[in-house]
Amino acid sequence: MPQILSPKGTIMKLYNSLTRTKDEFIPHEPGKVSMYTCGPTVYHFAHIGNLRTYIMEDVLEKYLRYTGLDVKRVMNITDVGHLSSDADTGEDKMLKGAKREKKTVMEIAKFYTDAFFADCEKLNIKLPDVIEPATGCIDEFIKVIEALIEKEYAYEAGGNIYFDTSKLKQYYLFNNFEEEDLQDGVREGVEKDDNKRNKADFVLWFTKSKFDDQELKWNSPWGIGYPGWHIECSCISMKHLGEYLDIHCGGIDNAFPHHTNEIAQSEAYVGHKWCNYWFHVLHLNTNGGKMSKSKGEFLTVSLLEEKGYNPLVYRFFCLQSHYRKSLVFSYENLDNAVAAWEKLLARVAKLDKNGDVDNAKFEELKRDFTDAMDNDLNTSLGVTALYNVLKADTNDATKLALIADFDKVLSLNLIEEASKLGAQEEPLDDEFTAKVEALIAERAAAKKEKNFAEADRIRGVLTEMGVEIKDTREGVVWQRI
């Protein structure tokens, strides 16, 4: 199979959670990339930790497109079946949200789906090419489950349909978990289920639920019920991307059991390797640990906006760290990002767009950026490459062209935001200058009338404004201090 090259001829490498190494990225079909993203469970607002994952997935998609690849990206919306333990126990999260807000499940799903899309727009996250809610694919779920039963990878017990993990040569792929990790009470959310043949088995379809008020149910060959969480991503991916998937993305907390179970059921169904590359983004942490809705400790984009933060500053904050490193959020750290952001915009605003682009210099400086991104999507070094452009010995037109080029991937709207900054500052500077000049004229008049006390008072006013004045033979000169 031919290798897919970046614009300068080197091969992009991505850390693959499946192999635990940086692997050369080679799509199954030359020139085309199939990419699947685990979407939100829309029972509440996405917190900024969730959104860090979507930001980094967005950067990956945009960089693949930047290199000339044809990317088709698919994402699910979980609006049924995701239980609170991420396994097969606890309350359905959608039902939990509906009870909390005294609304129907579909009302909750619509509201929080729209809220998620709004957050993505604020953060310059491109929505995937295909977005499919789980409730729209019930027929596909049933078809795959029937096939798994026929192949003896699934069984019925106690009214539910379970996947039989004992049929697999290997189950634990992303971790070092052993059987005892699934013992009752050892891992959070693991509860006893006498219907399972093996502790690692998981539900494909529920007909017997401990929730009598489960709102969403469908007819199936096994009775009225609803799908398990894990089956939806496999089915939605295969529905739109086929039996071979290049990249599967998600947060690291989804690696087990969700992604592990996806691989199990998908490969049992298709009979061959399903996905070649697994891209996992690490947690956003606070001083109290991982940000989590279940703990009731989470921040939203809207809350950051209420506190005066531009959502793009949060994106910038995320890009300054590598996706495989846990990122510590604090307002102090975000304020540091604000300071760096404002300085960056101020430098961009000073660039003169007139002139011709130096193509040789453009390609030379671009190499720093593509080297960074080819090396496991190193956005931290990618941002450094941006700063190197500003310091480079080349003309402003070339610098602006490079900034615009890098921003196809970084999506920080740097030139647009810098233009806003310049437009805001210019009238303020004119107003400030006019006020200073008026005070200097008043001081000159006071000195001419030998009213030195008034002249000293005006000097004090100017000092409080951050202005230093000097009397010279040519007149008064002033500068900010």
For the regions a protein language model found, what residue spans apply to each?
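Short, glycine/charge-rich beta-strand/loop segments that flank catalytic centers
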Residues: 74-80, 109-116, 126-141, 159-168
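Alpha-helical recognition segments enriched in aromatics with Gly/Pro capping
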Residues: 2-43, 58, 117-118, 138-350
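Anion (oxyanion) recognition and catalysis
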Residues: 65, 149, 463
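Short, well-structured beta-strand/strand-turn elements
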Residues: 70-72, 152-158, 393, 468-470
